[in-house]
Amino acid sequence: MDVVSLTPLMERTSGRREIVIGLLDGPVAVTHPDLVSAIVREIPGKQGGTSAHASSAACLHGTFVAGILCAQRGASAPAICPSCTLLVRPIFLETIVTSDQMPSATPDALAAAIIETIEAGARVLNLSVALAQPSTRGERVLEEA
């Protein structure tokens, strides 16, 4: 946290409800004890933003990142901006996978999710993703989004 100077910022503010942070990741287990007071919305009409399978790799990752952003202060997660609104747009399929598989999404799906999340009001995006294979087309689609 101190490497990126977040501690002084976190001492000054916990964020504001009107600041909407888009989380493009897996679904989120909103019933997690550290997230019960978090302000979480999901993009309507899409695959659910809340987790149906808490043990899926997608849900574990989405919930972990949500905790970093908006868990209750004093919880096990950093809780960088717990008073901001978290807008969840899952991009990872919620399947039970083996330990050597990572959740994935295509560049097209990620680009569409970026656009949808911005159109739904997010002004800050959190993406914990990388291209698995180099792709000029994939990079171009993401740049356009």
Question: What does each of the following model-derived ranges do?
Answer:
Residues 108-119, 143:
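Amphipathic, non-transmembrane alpha-helical secondary structure
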